[in-house]
């Protein structure tokens, strides 16, 4: 008889049962542990240490102060590879990270293999049935169809352009007030540019049906302030209080900020959004009121449409499009459906939040690079010579129709450096990317400012896909440097031209899921930058207020946005 048999025969039966039960329990726990461990995709680099933890990379990502976008960039750099994967914890699929190299962006954004990512959709439930939050399908096509006329030259020139120009002139007036009340001291521009974008996007949609200007309220408020009683910050920057907004505009601003917070929350986004939408005593009344407000304006547009009046507002154009589509399909229009309300509401939120972030970066970079600012001013003064002779600022039509290659290069370079950081896509079917199998449903993040922005790739693994960036001009080879020259070329006649087609930035995405509002945003940036550079000199601000630290939510948003203005005084 073996020692084991002797030991077992002398062991009480109840102890044997406990021993057996313990063995089964430990085996089950180990099996559960193995089941909960991340399952990396074969062949794609990953963190070996993270693969041995059921939490994968989640804890490291959570504790990284630089945020998701920078963390993704560091993973690619650490692996020395243009593709790697992040392990996202128990029972979650890996997320594939891809550097913006070779044909990766075209593969991700130009092929039907990849679609709008659930990663984004799940983080913006407060958008409701807005097209941004839909997979590509019939509802998405219907919603996008309503917006087609808002991209037409007639709308851009006759409706959008004048509305933007009028709002920027109000912003200039506001900043002149702040300059005088604050005795020329530095002040923050962030809130004012959000107010500009808010006024503009509301004017796009409602036109003369809504005449309560947020900028007018700020102008009246600042004009009544006593500069000697205004508080100052650490660097003697002046701090201005804000006027209350119309309740609808205040709600749009607050919900936009809350969406940005939900994007980065550590709580389940759907749970937080549910609480905001249905429970919060502050936000719940807005969601109820905004539906009534937007429906009222849709009904006004329907009455105008059926009275054969020409469309004059963004809502008018949407209603005309839906009326035509319903007639063609022999169905009832959906004017009373939530999908149309949410489309208008979503555009109001997204339009003011993302554009204002870009406007801040434009003025920050021009202040940081005075030689670029002066060169831009020289171009504008030359092109708008007749306006200069008449001692006036150029009109919206003059700005929109003029060829301004250096201005276009400044805007393109700003968007390249300070816009998209991550572009998420979902694999719509089993596919391949950079030679690796990508299963259906996998989230892929295109990392737009990864290690490929550095002059020297960190590893031989880049060699097969690391082609030189096809920027047309002769800009600085360091892609982290702001240099508009990389977008400028000379034509056969020797004239300077802007060429943004060779390697387009991803601020508005690519392919059919690109941002529909790109043209509107570019017109707004063009008009704002032109008028500001002609009216003001953007001077340097104290070092402690200069930083380019940013947060990444709906957009890439500067944490510091300060202005030190000098009025040029040429214009009334």
UniProtKB/Swiss-Prot annotation:
Claim: Oxidoreductase is one of the keywords in the record: yes
Cofactor(s), by name: heme
Gene Ontology molecular-function annotations: heme binding; iron ion binding; monooxygenase activity; oxidoreductase activity, acting on paired donors, with incorporation or reduction of molecular oxygen
Enzyme class, UniProt record, top EC level: oxidoreductase
UniProt key word Heme: yes
Pathway: Secondary metabolite biosynthesis
Keywords: Heme, Iron, Metal-binding, Monooxygenase, Oxidoreductase
Pfam family, one: p450
GO biological process assignments: mycotoxin biosynthetic process
Similarity field: Belongs to the cytochrome P450 family.
Taxonomic superkingdom: Eukaryota
The enzyme's E.C. designation: 1.-.-.-
SUPFAM superfamilies: Cytochrome P450
Function per UniProt: Cytochrome P450 monooxygenase; part of the gene cluster that mediates the biosynthesis of the 6-methyl-2-pyrone derivative xylariolide D. XilC hydroxylates the 5-alkyl-6-methyl-2-pyrone backbone called prexylariolide D, produced by the highly reducing polyketide synthase xilA, on its side chain to form xylariolide D.
Name the UniProt record assigns to this protein: Cytochrome P450 monooxygenase xilC
Coiled coil ranges: none
Binding locations of heme: 515
Disulfide bond entries: none
């Amino acid at each position: 008889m073996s020692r084991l048999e002797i030991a077992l025969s002398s062991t009480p039966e109840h102890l044997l049962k406990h021993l057996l039960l313990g063995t089964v329990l430990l085996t089950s726990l180990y099996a559960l542990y193995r089941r909960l461990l991340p399952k990396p995709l074969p062949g794609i680099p990953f963190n070996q240490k993270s693969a041995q933890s059921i939490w994968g990379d989640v804890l490291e990502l959570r504790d990284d102060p630089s945020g998701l976008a920078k963390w993704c960039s560091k993973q690619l750099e650490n692996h020395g590879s243009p593709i790697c994967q992040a392990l996202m914890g128990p029972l979650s699929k890996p997320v594939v990270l891809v550097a913006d190299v070779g044909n990766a962006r075209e593969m991700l954004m130009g092929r039907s293999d990849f679609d709008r990512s659930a990663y984004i959709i799940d983080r913006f439930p407060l958008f409701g049935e807005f097209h941004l939050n839909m997979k590509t399908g019939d509802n998405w096509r219907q919603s996008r169809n309503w917006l087609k006329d808002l991209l037409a030259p007639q709308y851009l020139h006759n409706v959008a352009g004048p509305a933007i120009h009028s709002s920027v002139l109000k912003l200039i007036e506001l900043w002149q007030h702040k300059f005088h009340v604050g005795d020329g001291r530095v002040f923050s521009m962030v809130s004012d540019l959000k107010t500009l974008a808010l006024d503009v996007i509301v004017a796009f949609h409602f036109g003369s049906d809504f005449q309560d200007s947020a900028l007018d309220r700020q102008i009246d408020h600042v004009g009544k302030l006593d500069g000697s009683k205004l508080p100052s910050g650490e660097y003697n920057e002046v701090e201005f209080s804000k006027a209350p907004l119309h309740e609808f505009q205040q709600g749009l601003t607050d919900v936009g900020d809350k969406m940005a917070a939900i994007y980065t929350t550590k709580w389940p986004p759907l749970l937080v959004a549910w609480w905001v939408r249905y429970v919060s005593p502050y936000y719940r009344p807005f969601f109820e009121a905004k539906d009534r407000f937007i429906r009222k304006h849709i009904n006004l547009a329907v009455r105008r449409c059926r009275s054969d009046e020409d469309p004059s507002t963004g809502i008018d154009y949407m209603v005309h499009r839906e009326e035509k589509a319903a007639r063609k399909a022999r169905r009832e229009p959906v004017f009373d459906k939530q999908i149309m309300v949410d489309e208008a509401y979503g555009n109001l939120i997204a339009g003011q939040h993302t554009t204002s972030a870009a406007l801040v970066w434009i003025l920050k970079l021009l202040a940081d690079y005075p030689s670029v600012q002066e060169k831009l001013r020289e171009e504008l003064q030359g092109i708008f010579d007749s306006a200069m002779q008449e001692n006036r600022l150029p009109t919206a039509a003059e700005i929109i129709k003029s060829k301004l290659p250096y201005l276009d290069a400044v805007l393109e370079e700003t968007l390249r450096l300070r816009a998209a950081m991550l572009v998420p896509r979902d694999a719509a079917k089993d596919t391949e990317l950079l030679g690796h199998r990508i299963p259906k449903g996998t989230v892929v993040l295109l990392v737009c400012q990864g290690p490929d922005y550095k002059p020297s790739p960190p590893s031989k693994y880049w060699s097969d896909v690391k082609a030189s960036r096809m920027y047309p001009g002769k800009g600085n080879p360091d892609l982290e440097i702001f240099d508009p020259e990389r977008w400028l070329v000379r034509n056969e006649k020797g004239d300077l031209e802007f060429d943004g087609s060779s390697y387009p930035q991803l601020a508005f995405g690519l392919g059919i899921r690109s941002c529909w509002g790109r043209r509107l945003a570019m017109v707004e940036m063009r008009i704002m930058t032109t008028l500001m550079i002609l009216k003001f000199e953007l001077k340097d601000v104290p070092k402690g207020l200069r930083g380019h630290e940013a947060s990444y939510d709906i957009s890439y948003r500067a944490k510091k946005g300060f202005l030190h203005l000098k009025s040029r005084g040429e214009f009334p």
